[in-house]
UniProtKB/Swiss-Prot annotation:
Active site: 116 (schiff-base intermediate with acetoacetate)
Reaction(s) catalysed (UniProt annotation): acetoacetate + H(+) = acetone + CO2
Record InterPro entries: Acetoacetate_decarboxylase, Acetoacetate_decarboxylase_bac, ADC_dom_sf
Sequence intervals crossing the membrane: none
Family named by the database record: Belongs to the ADC family.
Enzyme Commission code(s) on record: 4.1.1.4
Species this chain originates from: Burkholderia cenocepacia (strain HI2424)
Phylogenetic classification of the source organism: Bacteria, Pseudomonadati, Pseudomonadota, Betaproteobacteria, Burkholderiales
Gene3D superfamilies found in the cross-reference section: Acetoacetate decarboxylase-like
The name this protein goes by in its record: Acetoacetate decarboxylase
Function: Catalyzes the conversion of acetoacetate to acetone and carbon dioxide.
Length: 246
């Protein structure tokens, strides 16, 4: 194969059979359980990279069920998103996500810079409540519950919240182990069709784990819980800050 052929075909690895396809990446009936809680503000400031700014000591703990996604298939994801501001613009910084499917792990890390790791999350209705769990290996590290559809939420408001900017710290090492890419990336959910939004009483339990340290941001108080179902497109990203260029 000639170098020009490599350049023209290069998208992802392996070259002859990429781990994920080119987009757009559309999700149908994507289901969220988002439990917002108050945590230690000092710990937040220690882990959120500038120029992002922590405005409130809050964390969104998310369980996401994606049964129909373009190119990625059927999978579930769980992790923590921290409310932040960038140049006065409110958004969410994804700290870490744990999921059970290789293509979105590879694509998420290589394209956008999603901090994804392999684990075993679940999200389903358990009799009278919706239940989210996260197991890392044989250890249960997160359990979230919410009363099932106790009260409807405003569809337009929840659509607007989901459409806000999201931020990622994309890191790709050079072959010698030094940083080759170290960028703050912004992306948006696009073409959102909110099909339902509800709230109810909720609980969240986090357990310590050396390699899935969700409990490092302790739950001090449950602030809000939301159960959402939507169709949406995961938009590609843009670099807003290059740490290596500073």
């Amino acid at each position: 194969m000639k170098p020009s052929d490599v350049r023209s075909k290069a998208f992802a690895m392996p070259l002859t059979s990429p781990a994920f396809p080119m987009g757009p990446y559309r999700f149908v009936d994507r289901e969220f359980l988002i439990i917002t809680y108050r945590t230690d503000p000092d710990r937040l400031r220690e882990i959120v990279p500038e120029p992002l700014q922590v405005t409130e000591p809050l964390v969104h703990y998310e369980f996401i069920r994606m049964a129909d996604s373009t190119g990625f298939g059927d999978y579930t994801e769980s992790g923590q998103v921290i409310p932040v501001e960038y140049e006065g613009q409110p958004g969410g910084y994804t700290l870490a996500m744990y999921l059970d499917d290789h293509p979105p792990i590879a694509g998420g890390r290589e394209l956008w810079g999603f901090p994804k790791k392999l684990a075993s999350p679940t999200l389903h209705v358990n009799t009278d409540h919706i239940l989210g769990t996260l197991d890392y290996g044989k250890v249960r590290v997160a359990t979230g519950t919410m009363g099932y559809k106790h009260k409807e939420l405003d569809i337009d408001e929840q659509t607007k919240r989901l459409a806000g900017p999201n931020f990622l710290l994309k890191i790709i090492p050079h072959v010698d182990g030094t940083a080759r890419v170290c960028e703050l990336v912004r992306y948006y959910m696009q073409d959102i069709k909110m099909k339902g939004a509800w709230t109810g009483p909720a609980s969240l339990e986090l357990a310590p784990h050396a390699l899935a340290p969700v409990a490092d941001l302790p739950v001090l108080e449950i602030v809000e819980a939301r159960h959402l179902v939507a169709d949406l497109t995961l938009g590609l990203g843009e670099v807003v800050y290059d740490y290596l260029a500073q």
